[in-house]
């Protein structure tokens, strides 16, 4: 006798159980008291608010945006970028700043290392005239300034460069050789406890750049660790491990690095994905190079021999020539980029965009027609009113 098996029910379509009326009344009373004491929205049912997608800031690399799973770095969260020296940590952070500014956002840069190069930042697209920069004297001052700027609610992104340079005041005022065990870790733990809630309320992304150190006496496993204690590892929603894997050369001249970023931690999407992209000297992340790589991966751009084709048209021979072609034709670059994002499900398809545009155009036409009709009604009503007053 065969056993009957019922198909598994989708959790989203499960029947909602009705709450006992007495318990429901008690819960509603408690929620009303919470709102009265702490303000509207302090506690609510998750279903009371419409589900909203997480706002993101693009990183400048399409490959990294796809690896993050949501199209960029999440707003209102803490992000840690760490890696060896000269691996591109600051460059990546500056690209995020530039992209936030391009969207009309406000950015701040806490330069604890006192090493920010405004000329290089401008080459990466940063609007240095509107960038808020602070070069604090000690770690407490740096984190206090960061906290005050975040609580203003006006920032979109703030970069702290770097955690290793957040030296506690006691260490600066003390003598060389004095022991200050755990002082920086306690400072970071206290600051992150204060910042986390403020970042979420303000919708500000905080990027902490960190350095690597080696643990002494570790014979098995990875001896590398980051500075500033363990608090940042817990509070960060995204942790990025950035490494230089290859030197890019034009003949004998080095023109940049091939960079790999591993998403070590990700609370927004599945972690442990990697992205590779070109980082060119004096130019930063090659957006066009990343678009070529990802478009080729999903089949939007095809490669035959050394020739690259897009929708049957040849883009050029050799990756460097295609990169230059896309740089000279930003409209084509954006079109290819949108198709790649659609393949990954981050945005609607091109057909959906066309439908949305048609709907928006139709709505605009109907609004204009309604406005014209209202004007005509007013125009005909005015003489009638005048004549009625004259008769009276």
Curated annotation (Swiss-Prot):
GO cellular component, as recorded: cytosol
UniProt: ATP binding residues: 83-90
Pfam family, one: RecA_C
Compartments where found: Cytoplasm
Bias (Low complexity): 379-392
Disulfide bonds: none
Top-level division of the source organism's lineage: Bacteria
Location of the region described as Disordered in the Swiss-Prot/TrEMBL record: 1-21, 372-392
Coiled coil: none
One GO process term, biological-process aspect: SOS response
CDD domains: RecA (cd00983)
Chief place where the protein resides: cytoplasm
Key words, A-Z: ATP-binding, Cytoplasm, DNA damage, DNA recombination, DNA repair, DNA-binding, Nucleotide-binding, SOS response
InterPro entries in the record: AAA+_ATPase, DNA_recomb/repair_RecA, DNA_recomb/repair_RecA_CS, P-loop_NTPase, RecA-like_C, RecA-like_N, RecA_ATP-bd, RecA_C_sf
Gene Ontology MF terms: ATP binding; ATP hydrolysis activity; ATP-dependent DNA damage sensor activity; damaged DNA binding; single-stranded DNA binding
Database matches in HAMAP family: RecA
Family from the record: Belongs to the RecA family.
Free-text function comment from the UniProt entry: Can catalyze the hydrolysis of ATP in the presence of single-stranded DNA, the ATP-dependent uptake of single-stranded DNA by duplex DNA, and the ATP-dependent hybridization of homologous single-stranded DNAs. It interacts with LexA causing its activation and leading to its autocatalytic cleavage.
Entry-linked PANTHER family: MITOCHONDRIAL DNA REPAIR PROTEIN RECA HOMOLOG-RELATED, RECA
Protein known as: Protein RecA
Source species of the chain: Bifidobacterium breve
Gene for this chain: recA
């Amino acid at each position: 006798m065969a056993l009957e098996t019922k198909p598994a029910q989708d959790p989203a379509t499960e029947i909602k159980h009705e709450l006992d009326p007495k318990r429901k009344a008690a819960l509603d009373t408690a929620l009303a008291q919470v709102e009265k004491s702490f303000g509207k929205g302090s506690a609510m049912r998750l279903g009371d608010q419409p589900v909203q997608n997480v706002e993101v800031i693009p990183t400048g690399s399409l490959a990294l945006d796809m690896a993050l799973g949501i199209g960029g770095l999440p707003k209102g969260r803490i992000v840690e970028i760490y890696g060896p020296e000269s691996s591109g940590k600051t460059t990546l952070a500056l690209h995020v700043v530039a992209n936030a500014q391009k969207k009309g956002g406000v950015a701040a840069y806490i330069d604890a290392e006192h090493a920010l190069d405004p000329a290089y930042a401008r080459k990466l697209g940063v609007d240095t005239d509107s960038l808020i920069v602070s070069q604090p004297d000690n770690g407490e001052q740096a984190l206090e300034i960061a906290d005050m700027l975040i609580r203003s609610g006006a920032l979109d992104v703030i970069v702290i460069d770097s955690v290793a340079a957040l030296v506690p005041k006691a260490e600066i005022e003390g003598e060389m050789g004095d022991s200050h065990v755990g002082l920086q870790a306690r400072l970071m733990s206290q600051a992150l406890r204060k910042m986390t809630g403020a970042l979420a309320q303000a919708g500000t992304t905080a990027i902490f750049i960190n350095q690597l150190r080696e643990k002494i006496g570790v014979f098995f496993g990875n001896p590398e660790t980051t500075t500033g204690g363990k608090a940042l590892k817990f509070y960060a929603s995204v942790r990025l491990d950035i490494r230089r894997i290859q030197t890019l050369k034009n003949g004998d001249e080095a023109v940049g690095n091939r960079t790999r970023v591993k998403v070590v931690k990700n609370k927004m999407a599945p972690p442990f994905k990697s992205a590779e992209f070109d980082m060119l000297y004096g130019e930063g992340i090659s957006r066009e190079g990343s678009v070529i790589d990802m478009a080729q991966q999903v089949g939007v751009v095809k490669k035959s021999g050394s020739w690259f084709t897009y929708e049957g048209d040849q883009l050029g021979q050799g990756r460097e020539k295609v990169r230059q072609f896309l740089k000279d034709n930003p409209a084509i670059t954006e079109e290819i980029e949108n198709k790649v994002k659609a393949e990954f499900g981050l945005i609607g398809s091109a057909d959906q965009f066309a439908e949305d545009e048609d709907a928006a155009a139709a709505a605009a036409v109907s609004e204009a027609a309604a406005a014209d009709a209202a004007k005509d009604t007013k125009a005909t009503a005015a003489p009638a009113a005048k004549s009625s007053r004259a008769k009276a």
